[in-house]
Amino acid sequence: MWKVIIRRILLMIPQLFILSILVFFFAKLMPGDPFSGLIGPHTDPHEVEALRRAAGLYDPWWEQYLRWLGNAIHGNLGMSYNLKEPVMTVIGHRAINTFWMSLLSVILTYLFAIPMSIVAARNEGKWQDQLWLTYNSITFGIPPYVFYLLIIFIFGYSLNWFPTGGTVSPDAMGIIPVFFSKIYHMILPAFSLAVFGTVGIFTYFRSGILDEQTQDYVRTARAKGVKEKVIFRRHILRNASLPIASNFGFVITGLLGGAIFAETIFGYPGLGQLFITSISGRDYSMITALILLNGFLGLLGALLSDIIMAMVDPRIRIQ
């Protein structure tokens, strides 16, 4: 298994290099530059021009890329021109919020999707199966932002059960009250992300269970008199869980991508909301850093999926 992990980590190096090139040229293709926002009716154009020259914006592109790459490797992704803080400092603060919300969302996703899949597969063609298939189809067809707006309108404004922004209540004092206040604030966005996260897992897991039930080893076990519950728990569920195990890493990175809409609509100060405000404020340093981070997390999710598959499937380790 360690050979699999080491091989995948080594493959990530050229992938990260290609990703950095794409991110750098994406930033170059964007209109304006980091100093365009400083231009105003009372701004001296010569001062802005001096800042551009000092930042090396007129150097050859390969010099700019190597300088940017070297700084990125050392953890220096520049300054946020809107927030007037180092990019890594801002991302570090926001990443904590997104991490905990995504973690809660992943937990809720699997708590919802796995029982739904088992009930639907065990009752194929019956009303239980049709109920969850209908739920899955409706959820797949609803635009996420419409669902988010509906949820926040019902539970945030109409019923006033949950807060509609922030991460903690102003009156929360002490470790325990702050902890529960943070969970309380992330319930709505995490639940909303989990609803859409169940779609893929439900489809994979239900199909996997139905497929495993028709395999020869299941018929052999039944012919030998093995109890149906034992066959289902020890054999069918274990083999059917391989697809969702391999999908685990992509679920995490997918939630981070989906958090862009969720955090913006729910007013949750995480990386997704930061990305939207950076685009509207043309904060180029922050935008490139967040794109690079999201790409890295995508590669990390693929690595995590491979590691999980190597752990649960002996055939991967042998290969």
From Swiss-Prot:
GO biological process: peptide transport; protein transport; transmembrane transport
Annotated keywords: Cell membrane, Membrane, Peptide transport, Protein transport, Transmembrane, Transmembrane helix, Transport
Compartments reported by the entry: Cell membrane
Predominant localisation class: membrane
Segments crossing the lipid bilayer: 9-29, 99-119, 137-157, 183-203, 248-268, 289-309
InterPro entries: BPD_transp_1_N, MetI-like, MetI-like_sf
Domain of life: Bacteria
Domain ABC transmembrane type-1: 95-305
Keyword match Cell membrane: yes
Keyword Zinc-finger: no
Lipid bilayer topology: Multi-pass membrane protein
GO CC, one annotated term: plasma membrane
Oligomeric and partner information: The complex is composed of two ATP-binding proteins (OppD and OppF), two transmembrane proteins (OppB and OppC) and a solute-binding protein (OppA).
Function: Part of the ABC transporter complex OppABCDF involved in the uptake of oligopeptides. Probably responsible for the translocation of the substrate across the membrane. Essential for uptake of peptides larger than three amino acids and for growth in milk.
Family: Belongs to the binding-protein-dependent transport system permease family. OppBC subfamily.
PANTHER family, sorted: DIPEPTIDE TRANSPORT SYSTEM PERMEASE PROTEIN DPPB-RELATED
Name under which the protein is recorded: Oligopeptide transport system permease protein OppB
Organism for this UniProt entry: Lactococcus lactis subsp. lactis (strain IL1403) (Streptococcus lactis)
Gene: oppB
